[in-house]
UniProtKB/Swiss-Prot annotation:
Pathway: Amino-acid biosynthesis; L-histidine biosynthesis; L-histidine from 5-phospho-alpha-D-ribose 1-diphosphate: step 2/9
Matches recorded under NCBIfam families: histidine_hisI (TIGR03188), PRK00400.1-3 (NF001611)
Catalytic activity: 1-(5-phospho-beta-D-ribosyl)-ATP + H2O = 1-(5-phospho-beta-D-ribosyl)-5'-AMP + diphosphate + H(+)
Pfam families: PRA-PH (PF01503)
GO cellular component: cytoplasm
InterPro entries: HisE, PRib-ATP_PPHydrolase-like
GO terms for MF: ATP binding; phosphoribosyl-ATP diphosphatase activity
UniProt-listed Enzyme Commission number(s): 3.6.1.31
Family per similarity comment: Belongs to the PRA-PH family.
Organism: Bacillus mycoides (strain KBAB4)
Gene: hisE
Keywords, ordered alphabetically: Amino-acid biosynthesis, ATP-binding, Cytoplasm, Histidine biosynthesis, Hydrolase, Nucleotide-binding
Name by which UniProt lists this protein: Phosphoribosyl-ATP pyrophosphatase
């Protein structure tokens, strides 16, 4: 699984280094961080709607869009995917208590 995510991220980085005129990825880079963040917000909202509709197929599709746009943000910020994967590895297996987390007041 990690390999396909790595390939996606590498493709995004390649588009950043070597733009293609008709590339949606390059469109996002050309519009900048605010556009990328807006798309992440839109895609997260679509995940929520798909989940509320109990539409598993749509949840999967929208999650892929979230991953993609988050990867574009990482590339925009020059944050290597390896940094994120290392954080996942460090968090994996750690015990977490509900009391350790801040209460969510509003949505």
């Amino acid at each position: 699984m990690e390999d396909i995510l790595k390939l996606l991220f590498e493709t995004i980085e390649e588009r950043k280094k070597n733009p293609l005129s008709e590339s949606y990825t390059n469109y996002l880079f050309s519009k900048g961080e605010d556009k990328i963040l807006k798309k992440i917000g839109e895609e997260c909202t679509e995940v929520i709607i798909a989940s509320k509709n109990n539409d598993k197929e749509e949840i999967v599709k929208e999650m892929v869009d979230v991953f993609y746009h988050c990867f574009v943000l990482l590339a925009e910020k020059n944050i290597p995917l390896e940094d994120v994967m290392q954080e996942v590895k460090e968090r994996n297996g750690k015990l977490s208590r509900v009391g350790d987390r801040r209460e969510i007041d509003t949505l």
